[in-house]
Amino acid sequence: MSDIALTVSILALVAVVGLFIGNVKFRGIGLGIGGVLFGGIIVGHFVSQAGMTLSSDMLHVIQEFGLILFVYTIGIQVGPGFFASLRVSGLRLNLFAVLIVIIGGLVTAILHKLFDIPLPVVLGIFSGAVTNTPALGAGQQILRDLGTPMEMVDQMGMSYAMAYPFGICGILFTMWMLRVIFRVNVETEAQQHESSRTNGGALIKTINIRVENPNLHDLAIKDVPILNGDKIICSRLKREETLKVPSPDTIIQLGDLLHLVGQPADLHNAQLVIGQEVDTSLSTKDTDLRVERVVVTNENVLGKRIRDLHFKERYDVVISRLNRAGVELVASGDISLQFGDILNLVGRPSAIDAVANVLGNAQQKLQQVQMLPVFIGIGLGVLLGSIPVFVPGFPAALKLGLAGGLLIMALILGRIGSIGKLYWFMPPSANLALRELGIVLFLSVVGLKSGGDFVNTLVNGEGLSWIGYGALITAVPLITVGILARMLAKMNYLTMCGMLAGSMTDPPALAFANNLHPTSGAAALSYATVYPLVMFLRIITPQLLAVLFWSIG
């Protein structure tokens, strides 16, 4: 058997063994995709004992290609929500998550200096302790750029594997410990979270209001500032027994009922100006109007603002709200459409069908992947990561590297959505498939390279010390920030658990947090809020630590 055939066969075996290990769960908790790393270590140990020779060049290419696929698809997935997560609504959660990353970096730096841990080893421990595989790839990339010998770079994968198990268990232990310390009643926390969402959350809501302000009588909707802005959409108007879709030129009269869509605070302001909320239904049932959700798939409307499409004027159809990457938004006129946006339309059936034709609404296109934008994005990301930045006093030019360059480019492209007829939307199933393939390839090679010396390092070397260092890097930031968030910020426990899981980009921890109260979405919401920014920081941090430690010797 040729070296290439043998290498591919061994990688396939690693994937099978690793995925099997990852699917084994104890009380609902398993290693998940991280099991591939340990599958690689097991197979790598026996490959080394048998004296088999694998193609090192091929292993290197597969490892890098796997990292490229994984990081790029993560960036495309979280791109639409990344910049939104930096806004005020998620600012507090992101600040605490960033603090966890910073404290973890400081603990790593202190351990490196106190115990004189080799740079590749301490970076591997850091990456494993925070259960972040892209950080491992980014760290190995920067070490190679700094001229570190390959045998030293491979040690990073071994130390990563030592620290990884407690990285998963440590966050679960932290959640349990915080629950005990603060005597948390999970049911009460879930009720409080639901109450805060209902009363003050930045969710999109609807209300029906009666026009009671005499100053608004006989005014066109476009002449009422609060109805002509970008924060509230008036999608239906009922006068006596007639329900219709209002246009900007529609005249409102005293006693009219308006169906408004917006955030709670803005709707409250509308009540102060227009009139009181009423219980009267403005349902389209048994009327000539209907409400329908339509998906944007037509390349000709991508990048165009809603107001420039003139749906109200041409078709008498109102877009009441927009769902982008799972986030509900008010469909203001200045929003530019992206591929995959889901629009809530209100109008007559024939008019809605006409608008749907303009927007595309081709469900099958959501299952198709445009490969040209994928490779354009990967190429641009690699180029961005290769741009050197020379800083006086540093031993090597700073680069974002494969991981950093691809992540930033994918975040930007995911946020832009489309350029002309090129769109960077990727169906969730396709994104997940490429992401899983990439991480399996990457971890398989890392495990294989680490497996030869893993057992000896654990039994006769410093493996146990590495596990202890990793436990500190995992536990200290989580416990510190968890206590601060609960005591100072009075953060909801379920929200805090989601934030802690997101700060470690740890899906098993999110599964554990969700199971604390299966019907509450608090943990998932906070996890999604901090995940994009934290993923970016986790990939950048080992590169910054590597350059810093290298420069100060």
UniProtKB/Swiss-Prot annotation:
Xref: SUPFAM superfamilies: TrkA C-terminal domain-like
**Superkingdom of the source species:** Bacteria
Q: Where in the cell is it found?
A: Cell membrane
Organism (species):
Shigella sonnei (strain Ss046)
- Give the record's family classification: Belongs to the AAE transporter (TC 2.A.81) family. YidE subfamily.
* InterPro entries given in the database record: AAE_transporter (IPR050144), RCK_C (IPR006037), RCK_C_sf (IPR036721), Transpt_YidE_put (IPR023018), YidE_YbjL (IPR006512)
The record's Gene Ontology biological-process terms are: potassium ion transport
Please give, as recorded in its UniProt entry, the membrane topology of this protein. Multi-pass membrane protein
Give the protein name, as stated in the record: Putative transport protein YidE
Q: Does the record bear Disulfide bond in its keywords?
A: no
The main location is: membrane
Q: Please provide one cellular component term from the Gene Ontology annotations of this protein.
A: plasma membrane
Keywords for the protein's UniProt record, in alphabetical order:
Cell membrane, Membrane, Repeat, Transmembrane, Transmembrane helix, Transport
Paired cysteines (S-S): none
Q: Which Pfam families match?
A: Asp-Al_Ex, TrkA_C
The RCK C-terminal domain is annotated at: 191-276, 279-361
GO terms assigned for molecular function:
monoatomic cation transmembrane transporter activity
NCBIfam families per UniProt: PRK03818.1, YidE_YbjL_dupl
Q: Where are the transmembrane segments?
A: 4-24, 28-48, 65-85, 95-115, 158-178, 371-391, 393-413, 431-448, 464-484, 493-513, 533-553
